[in-house]
Regions:
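Acidic, metal/ion-coordinating pockets
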Residues: 19-212
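Sec-dependent N-terminal signal peptides
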Residues: 4-14
Length: 212
């Protein structure tokens, strides 16, 4: 049986050194809540808050890192762990489509939906998945069209499996009609099933989760 390294994506920036001496840069976002505009960082200094550069700044950083990585024959993987649009007027007025446009511009590799991504219903979540140039992955989520179990990425010859998992508590804080027909299966049982499904196809497995 093939031995697989399994890692949970729970850090912001990580570099991993593989045996063939290239770096895998993991870029990770979470709880964007539609805030891709410039916003004051009141958590740093409530009286004299520096301005966070927002989506444009994130694009500049990711583009710079990808350019540098390409020159060194390294690889950049960009993922998100959900709650992408609810929380700002920019995000909510069109159900998150503007945020998906930005994420397409950023060239995300995959995202796992969060609880707040159901705020305009499961059909809206399916619509967002159809608008994205990258997969929405949540292997334990049932009843939502367009959601995939996993994604396999070829990173300079190293095959990486991304398995998505979502919290079973999606009903908390949501109107019942927003998750009607939706079910979430057991996290660990589903994870074991997905690992067995892809372990012979990949060298590394990352778990991209929204479990908080």
């Amino acid at each position: 049986m093939k031995k697989i390294t399994i890692l949970f994506l729970n850090v912001i920036f990580v570099n991993l050194l593989f045996s063939n001496s290239f770096k895998l840069h993991l870029l990770f976002t979470n709880n964007i809540h539609g805030a891709i505009h410039e916003v004051p960082a009141r958590f740093i200094n409530p009286e004299f808050s520096p301005i966070l550069a927002g989506g444009a700044g994130a694009f500049t950083y990711a583009s710079k890192l990808r350019k540098e990585a390409k020159l060194k024959e390294d690889f950049v993987m960009l993922t998100d762990a959900g709650n992408i649009f609810q929380g700002s007027q920019l995000g909510t007025y069109d159900g998150g489509s503007n945020i998906i446009k930005w994420m397409n511009w950023m060239a995300y590799d995959a995202i796992v939906p969060g609880v707040r991504d159901f705020d305009q219903g499961a059909n809206n979540l399916s619509k967002l998945a159809s608008e994205a140039n990258f997969p929405f992955i949540a292997s334990n989520l049932e009843g939502v069209d367009g959601i995939e179990d996993y994604k396999i990425i070829n990173a300079n010859g190293v095959k990486i499996g991304l398995i998505g998992l979502i919290t079973p508590f999606i009903s908390e804080g949501l109107l019942p009609e927003y998750y009607e027909g939706v079910a979430v299966s057991d996290i660990m049982k589903t994870l074991g099933t997905q690992i067995e499904k892809i372990r012979d196809e990949v060298d590394l497995i990352f778990v991209l989760s929204h479990l908080g």
